[in-house]
From Swiss-Prot:
Highest taxon of the lineage: Bacteria
Organism ancestry: Bacteria, Pseudomonadati, Pseudomonadota, Gammaproteobacteria, Vibrionales
Renumbered residue ranges of the record's region Disordered: 42-64
Manner of cofactor binding, per the entry note: Binds 1 zinc ion.
Quaternary context: Interacts with GyrB.
Gene3D superfamilies named in the record: Erythroid Transcription Factor GATA-1, subunit A
Protein role: Inhibits all the catalytic activities of DNA gyrase by preventing its interaction with DNA. Acts by binding directly to the C-terminal domain of GyrB, which probably disrupts DNA binding by the gyrase.
Family: Belongs to the DNA gyrase inhibitor YacG family.
Keyword annotations of the record: Metal-binding, Zinc
Protein name: DNA gyrase inhibitor YacG
Keyword Transferase: no
Acidic residues bias: start-end ranges: 54-64
Names of the cofactor(s): Zn(2+)
């Protein structure tokens, strides 16, 4: 017997069955997925930790 895994949509809290029948998992819908993406793009969400202020990417804000 296969155990069905149910997770809560991180955006609205709706129960979502974790499997191929839920293409937007862990979200319940494309709408919730896009709302979450927008929050990350607007920097409303962030991964905790100190910001990396090094210039290791080779880019600089100085004009030449």
């Amino acid at each position: 017997m296969t155990k069905i895994t149910i997770v809560k949509c991180p955006q609205c809290g709706t129960n979502v069955e974790w499997g191929e029948q839920s293409p937007h998992r862990p979200f319940c819908s494309k709408k919730c997925q896009m709302i979450d993406f927008g929050e990350w793009a607007d920097e409303e969400n962030a991964i905790p930790g100190a910001p990396d202020m090094s210039d290791s990417d080779g880019w600089s804000e100085e004009q030449y």
